């Protein structure tokens, strides 16, 4: 039982840490202005010109000013609501632009709640965590007189639908409806109880499609969710879900976070995120996806790791790692859970900023307004260093 408890605790702090398939910033616009110019006539004079020789000065060399990026790492203009949808044997959370009550408080998520009740007593209290979702439970749905594009998020192996609230809520704040569902066949509860597997073939993709159906049927969210503009993203095994779901007609663009290539690569606009030191899904596996894409951007974060893209990474970083578990589960499993979440890894919040910036820019460019998204450029000097930033074709081709 000690081993099982340790494994459960490890999974809690490092959700999505492995898979077997790889699988208020504002747009800066110059204000309109008109500069008035005046011409003053000089008094008329008569002069006798002397012969002169004039040598023309060569024109000054032209200079090109690099385009200034628009940053999306800060929260967008919308407050965010959260609603939970019942999908039968599993649930999905929806983050959406909202109008909260003046005295409303954002929802705090207790990660201990994702475990079966009979196991919760065995989880050490100091290793559990609470996360501010920065979203308001059941807040009034904003009506922007048009529907918002939809984004699906898929969690990793041993994960749960709330594994990356820093990301899902952030995307919604920029005017998107974000839906994230539990994949119970490979989720945290199944890992904790030893019941992994089962479900239909491609069950995780079916989970996403079923969540879209439930979203469309929701009386308040359905009318503001534009299922003609749809993206999917996912971390680790969820990145594999994203790549496979991209083959579905409903999906227009997709994103992959610390994941490898699927057996069949779909040619739609894509973004690929990599942690430089990821030892769980090694970078070459992620490059295996990017190298096959016609229209894509790849972003490789210096000193980033596999779990740099999850809520739990901050807690592990603040603890200084999980060395207290080595005696129970061994250094290899501890290293797997710590991947990207202990120094000298990049601070988790900086990895969050990079992921949030490029994700929102990619979505705005493809679904709303390419001009408002700004140029797609390396933000190493503005957020945190990247070891690789490359574009192939036109990642904004869906616009």
For each predicted feature, which ranges?
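Short substrate-entry loop that stabilizes the transition state in hydrolases
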Residues: 128-190, 279-283
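Extracellular mucin-like PTS domains
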Residues: 27-64
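Short beta-strand/loop motif that positions the catalytic acidic residue
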Residues: 272-274, 278
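Alpha/beta-hydrolase-fold serine-hydrolase catalytic core, especially in secreted/extracellular enzymes
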Residues: 67, 77, 88, 312-399
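Alpha/beta-hydrolase active-site loop
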Residues: 163, 167, 194-227, 232, ...
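Domain-level recognition of soluble alpha/beta enzyme cores
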Residues: 60-151, 336-345
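Gly/Ala-rich beta-loop-alpha elbow adjacent to hydrolase catalytic centers
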Residues: 234-238, 242
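C-terminal motif of bacterial Sec signal peptides marking the signal peptidase cleavage site
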Residues: 13-16
């Amino acid at each position: 039982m000690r081993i099982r408890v340790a494994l459960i605790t490890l999974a809690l702090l490092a959700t999505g840490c492995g898979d077997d398939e790889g699988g208020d910033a504002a747009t800066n616009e110059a204000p309109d202005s008109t500069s008035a110019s005046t011409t003053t006539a000089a008094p008329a004079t008569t002069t006798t010109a002397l012969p002169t020789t004039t040598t023309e000065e060569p024109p000054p060399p032209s200079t090109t000013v690099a385009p200034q990026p628009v940053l999306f790492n800060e929260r967008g203009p919308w407050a965010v609501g959260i609603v939970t949808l019942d999908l039968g044997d599993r649930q999905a959370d929806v983050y959406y632009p909202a109008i909260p009550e003046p005295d409303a408080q954002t929802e705090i998520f207790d990660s201990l709640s994702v475990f079966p009740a009979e196991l919760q007593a065995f989880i050490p209290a100091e290793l559990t965590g609470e996360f501010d979702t920065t979203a308001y439970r059941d807040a009034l749905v904003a009506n922007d007189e048009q529907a918002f594009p939809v984004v699906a998020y898929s969690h990793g192996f041993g994960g749960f639908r709330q594994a990356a609230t820093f990301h899902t809520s952030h995307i919604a704040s920029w005017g998107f409806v974000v839906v994230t569902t539990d994949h119970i066949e490979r989720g945290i509860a199944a890992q904790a109880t030893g019941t992994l597997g089962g479900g239909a073939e491609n069950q995780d993709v079916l989970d996403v499609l079923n969540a879209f159906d439930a979203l469309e049927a929701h009386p308040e969210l359905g009318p503001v969710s534009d299922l003609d503009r749809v993206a999917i993203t996912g971390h680790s095994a969820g990145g594999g879900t994203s790549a496979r779901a991209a083959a579905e007609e409903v999906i227009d663009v997709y994103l992959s976070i610390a994941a490898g290539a699927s057996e069949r690569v779909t040619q739609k606009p894509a973004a690929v995120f990599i942690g430089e030191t990821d030892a769980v899904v090694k970078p070459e596996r992620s490059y295996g996806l990017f190298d096959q894409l016609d229209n894509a951007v790849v972003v490789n974060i210096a000193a980033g790791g596999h779990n740099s893209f999850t809520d739990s990474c901050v807690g592990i970083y603040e603890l200084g790692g999980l060395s207290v578990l080595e005696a129970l589960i061994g250094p290899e499993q501890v290293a797997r859970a710590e991947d990207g979440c202990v120094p000298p890894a990049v601070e988790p919040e900086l990895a969050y900023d990079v992921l949030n910036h490029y994700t929102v820019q990619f979505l705005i460019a493809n679904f709303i307004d390419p001009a408002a998204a700004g140029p797609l450029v390396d933000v190493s000097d503005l957020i945190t260093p990247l070891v690789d930033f490359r574009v192939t074709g036109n990642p904004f081709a869906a616009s």
